Each structure stands twice: as C-alpha cells, then as structure tokens.
C-alpha cells in the first residue's frame, strides 16, 4: 500500500475536476487527479479521424462549443484565446422548428467558442502540470482514521490512493455509487431529481471539398425528432484543413433505445439519424463516405442546480460533489462548479 497521503484527491479529469485542481494547486496544496480514461476534459472530447497514412483530423463528438457569461469564466476564456486554445466560432445557430429552418434569433446571439484542434484542447490546457493518474477506475471509496482511501477496479493492479479531502467530479449516477452513502437524506433526494440523459453521436465524413456555408450548427426544436443537434464540424477547422465532417447528436429519448446496442446496431442508428439530418440540412447529408457512432451514457443533465453549484457531504472529512449536472449544465457551469467547491474547501482549511 502506498504511504503517500495527498492533501486532496479528485475523481475525474473533466472540466469541473480540472478547474478545482487548478485552484487548489494555486493555493499550494498537493492534489492528485484520478481519471478512468486516457484523455482529459470529460465530454469536451475529440476523436482523431484518420484520413490516410499520416493524416488525421479532429472531430468533436462530445461538447460542441461553450459560452462565457460569468466574469471569472470570461477571464479564463480570454486567457485561452491569448494562448490559442479557443476562438469565437459562432454568434448564434439556426433552428429547425415546425419543419422550417430558421435563422439565428438575435435575442440569443451570444458568442459560442470552440477549439481549432478540437474541444479536448480545453482538458489539455486545464490539465497542464497536474499530477494525473490515468486509466485509474475508482471502484470504491472508504474513510478511515481521517483519511479517504480510493481503491481501483479489481482488474487493475493499481495501489489505493489516499487523501485528506476528496472531490468527486464523475457523472452524478457514478458519483452516487461511489459516495452516495456519505450524503444526507436531503442531498440524496435532491440528486434523485437530476437526470442524466444519454446521447448517440454520429461523425459523418463527406468528400473533400464539400462545403456547408449556410450553417455552422442547427438546434433541432421538434419534440418528436430523433435529432437534437447538427454541426458542420469542419467550420471549426482552418480553411485549408483536410476532410469534411458533420456531427449529429441524437435526442435523449431516441438515444435511450440504443444504450445496450452492439456496434453493428449503433451503425444502424447512425444511418437512421443521417436520413433525418438530410431532411433538415440537405440530401447530401445522407451520402457520407463513412460514419462512426459514439454512445455517451451520461450526456444531458437536467434538473435543479445545487446551491453554490456543488454539494458538500456532512461527513467528518471534506467530501464534495462537483460537475455541470449540479450547476446548470454547460462547460461554463462545470468550470464554475469546480472553482466554487475548491474555494469553499480552501476556506474551510484556512479557518480550521
């Protein structure tokens, strides 16, 4: 067993976990992040699509963009722009409603930011310099003698990780499995009101030179449509970038039907979604060169926000739950949730 006891352990290297880690490390504490996958950023995720030997292009199959309304997050976004991490992608998206494609509503023309190299750049930027243990799936959490003990999935040979304080930034259903017993009855009842809907994402490749100048993104507002979102992903890339890609996100109700589907069945779902997309964006969308389908089990949190944007469990040692599901969704909500929890933890440490 490792004898190292960290000041803080964070489960999950999504936006909220990385945001919290940055603020905690800034205060001089020792923080370690445990991430079950190889990548950083959670649903701010990018797939590297191979076009030919030695040529790959990024395609965003998770979070598509982000806005910045809070002043603190606006400052962060300004720094990212200076560093070349992100850029202003769009001032508004078209909507599909009542069988008609509508121009962006001036009322909702906030700047939408994206990343030239893919949305995973956010996780890479936030994770720089941190102590991160990748491919560490936390199977159980115990508290003993004032220390949190995080145990890896039995299939891994990783030693437990120990810390005096714990932040869990995993999707809420997974967080509940790990530390739900540490929460009060009121907190458990509150979390039961938050749902995390799934999403089927389709990445479709089209012939080089294909252009889609009319729209960057389309928000689908038809209640019975299997589609919730369509993006011309190539509009995020440099003009001379190879490849031509669209991304389709399915609505939660449609996606729920495919949670247990095989790879072959998922491709069928992707083909169905492209047929629907063609009715909105044009028949050309139903003639891809290739398509890849990804399944997000926890994609769309819906429900009330937690007071302060996070939850603190009523246990002897600090335990926080953070994430966009507790703070209105969106990347900005995730970033602020982690920041708020970190500042609350630091205040409690400072005041004893």
Spans of features found by a protein language model:
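Beta1/beta-strand and adjacent pyrophosphate-binding region of the FAD-binding site
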Residues: 2-16
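Glycine-rich FAD pyrophosphate-binding loop
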Residues: 25-52
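Short beta-strand to alpha-helix junction loop
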Residues: 65-69, 101-125, 260-269
């Amino acid at each position: 067993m490792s004898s190292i006891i960290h000041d803080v352990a964070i489960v999950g290297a999504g936006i909220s976990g990385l945001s919290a880690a940055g603020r905690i490390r800034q205060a001089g504490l020792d923080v370690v992040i445990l991430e079950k996958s190889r990548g950083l950023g959670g649903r701010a995720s990018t797939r590297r699509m191979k076009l030919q030997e030695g040529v790959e292009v990024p395609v965003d199959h998770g979070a598509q963009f982000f806005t910045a309304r809070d002043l603190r997050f606006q400052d962060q976004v300004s720094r990212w722009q200076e560093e070349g991490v992100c850029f202003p992608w769009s001032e508004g998206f078209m909507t599909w409603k009542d069988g008609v494609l509508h121009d962006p509503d001036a009322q909702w023309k906030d700047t939408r930011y994206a990343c030239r190299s893919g949305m995973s750049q956010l996780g890479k930027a936030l994770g720089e310099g941190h102590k991160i243990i990748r491919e560490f799936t936390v199977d159980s959490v115990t508290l003993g003698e004032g220390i949190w003990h995080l145990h890896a999935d039995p299939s891994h040979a990783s030693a437990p990780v120990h810390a005096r304080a714990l932040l869990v930034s995993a999707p809420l259903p997974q967080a509940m499995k790990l530390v739900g017993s540490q929460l009060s009855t009121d907190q458990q009842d509150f979390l039961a009101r938050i749902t995390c809907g799934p999403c089927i994402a389709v990445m479709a490749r089209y012939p080089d030179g294909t252009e889609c100048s009319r729209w960057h993104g389309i928000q689908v507002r038809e209640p019975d449509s299997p589609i919730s979102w369509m993006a011309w992903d190539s509009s995020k890339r440099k003009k001379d970038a190879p490849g031509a890609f669209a991304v389709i996100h399915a609505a939660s109700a449609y996606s729920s039907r495919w949670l247990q589907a095989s790879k072959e069945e998922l491709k069928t779902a992707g083909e169905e979604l492209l047929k629907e997309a063609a009715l909105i964006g044009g028949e050309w969308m139903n003639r891809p060169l290739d398509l890849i389908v990804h399944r997000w089990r926890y994609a769309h949190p819906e429900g009330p926000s937690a007071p302060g944007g996070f939850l603190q469990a009523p246990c002897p040692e600090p335990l926080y739950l953070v994430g966009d599901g507790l703070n209105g969704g969106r990347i900005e909500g995730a970033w602020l949730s982690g920041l708020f929890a970190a500042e609350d933890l630091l205040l409690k440490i400072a005041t004893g």
